Structure formats: C-alpha cells, structure tokens
C-alpha cells in the first residue's frame, strides 16, 4: 500500500521506518519552540505532516518504547486513530508519567504510526439476550479468571 505524506513543515524529515522490519513509522515533532511537559501533564505536539490513507486503512499513533522507558512519556489516547478520510495535520497527544519535566524539541522522534487494515462491522440489534452467541466465559468480567 502507498502512504501519501504532505509536509506542512518543509524543514522536517519525512516520517520513516527506523529498521528494516519495524512495524511503526517514527513521527517527528514540528515545533517552533521547545515544549515542556510537566510531570502529570500532557500537550498536543504537531508533526508537520498530513497523510492520505487509502480507504480501508487507519493509522494508529503509539508511544515510542524508549521515551516510555527512559522518561515515562506515552501517547495519552493510545492508540490514537487517524481515519482514512482525515486530511488535517497529524498531532500527537503526549503525556508525561515521569518524575521530571520532559522537553520536546523540534525534529525529535515523539511517537510511531502503525498502518492497519480496518474491518467495518455490520451492526445488528437483537431483541433478547438469549440471541447472543454463548461462550464458556459468558459475562465474566474484570478479574473473573483470577489475579
């Protein structure tokens, strides 16, 4: 599949896979000034790009493991979803779970984007609970299999 990318910020690099078999495309911050994120706080960070996904695909925005491990930085609405019909700037909602302020600098790799196929369900209402498919688990919820 082809991912079309339009650079809103011509100075920043295109997003890219950082290894031959990486599933995530690294996204870069596109900020004029450094952005500080205090512990427990979050900020929307622009990437300076918009994307054109083919119909039947989505892009999921996910945290970078190195930022999570070293600084407690994550994508707050992880995974963030970019629908195939969205053409605005890709922005990442970063959250600081760390103990120190975290500074986002221009062109810093801040998140990764994974492209996935989308299956759209046909939604059918049933009249009675007994019309639902039965399973061994049935309605067992949180913690029903133990800790």
Task: Go through each PLM region and give its residues.
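DUTPase catalytic domain/fold
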Residues: 1-147
């Amino acid at each position: 599949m082809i991912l079309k990318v339009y650079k809103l910020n011509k100075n920043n690099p295109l997003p890219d896979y950082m290894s031959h078999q990486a599933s995530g495309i690294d996204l870069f911050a596109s900020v004029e000034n450094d952005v500080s994120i205090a512990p427990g706080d979050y900020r929307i960070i622009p990437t300076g790009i918009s994307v054109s996904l083919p119909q039947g695909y989505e892009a999921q925005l996910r945290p970078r493991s190195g930022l999570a491990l070293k600084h407690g930085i994550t994508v707050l609405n992880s995974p963030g979803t970019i629908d195939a019909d969205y053409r605005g700037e890709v922005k990442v909602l970063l959250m600081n779970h760390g103990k120190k302020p975290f500074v986002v600098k221009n062109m810093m790799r801040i998140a990764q984007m994974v492209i996935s196929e989308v299956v759209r369900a046909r939604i059918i209402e049933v009249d009675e609970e007994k019309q639902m498919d039965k399973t061994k688990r049935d309605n067992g919820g949180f913690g029903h299999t133990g800790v």
